[in-house]
């Protein structure tokens, strides 16, 4: 009667590692989190104001500017995300590799820009709560800031962020779709101007591009992929898909907002100077 020696620690290790091999959902969650983080970073108060004001200024011809900016946005973001995520290095790390000190200079610029943009985001969240609940915009900004701080203080902030931005992004698109349908915009005129615009303003196009992939916005999604471990040449297809889908989500939101505003202003309603976003939900 023979008995083979056993290694209890090896058995325990094998038993412990067996259930952890189911990784696809985590990868999918990281991809969704990255693209929605990028998209929701782009869709802020400036995004709403730009789209609303430019729609009033240009009318249906603004459709061409949106279409062209989406194409350019895809090219820019695809390039940035591939370089960063495939290398597995954040923008400042890669910059220091190319030229010592360049990464720190880039980080300072992004930090300054991020501070300015997030002051606007806090103000925008306050205006949003003011539009929904009628509370003072300053109190609304404090409430939104407290919620954000609570999320980032969590030990599972990364997982929470992936789920929260994906859920809120989907809700935001559905709400804007509803408003776009209810406002009954002249869709035929918008489609015609997409390929045959009545006027072209390259300043507007440049502004849209900067508001979508400028500053920290495009870095946010790429860095989220790196943080989640979705990097390296072997993940190039997932990186590419996530990059393009992030821009498409932003583009869908801009198109829906454009149609909603176009439908409202085509009836002769004037924009509110104090809270532009409130116009769509109160008209």
Task: Give the ranges of each region predicted by the language model.
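Hydrophobic alpha-helical segments and their helix-loop junctions in multi-pass secondary transporters
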Residues: 169-195, 205-223, 260-262
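Transmembrane alpha-helical segments of multi-pass small-molecule transport proteins
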Residues: 35, 107-108, 131-154, 168-180
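Selective recognition of specific alpha-helical transmembrane segments in multi-pass small-molecule
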Residues: 64-79, 172, 240-266
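Hydrophobic, small-residue-rich membrane helices and short re-entrant helix-turn-helix hairpins
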Residues: 50-55, 160, 217-252, 267-277
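Conserved small/polar residues in nucleotide/adenosyl-binding loops
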Residues: 281-282
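Hydrophobic transmembrane alpha-helices that form the core helical bundles
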Residues: 86, 103-134, 141-145
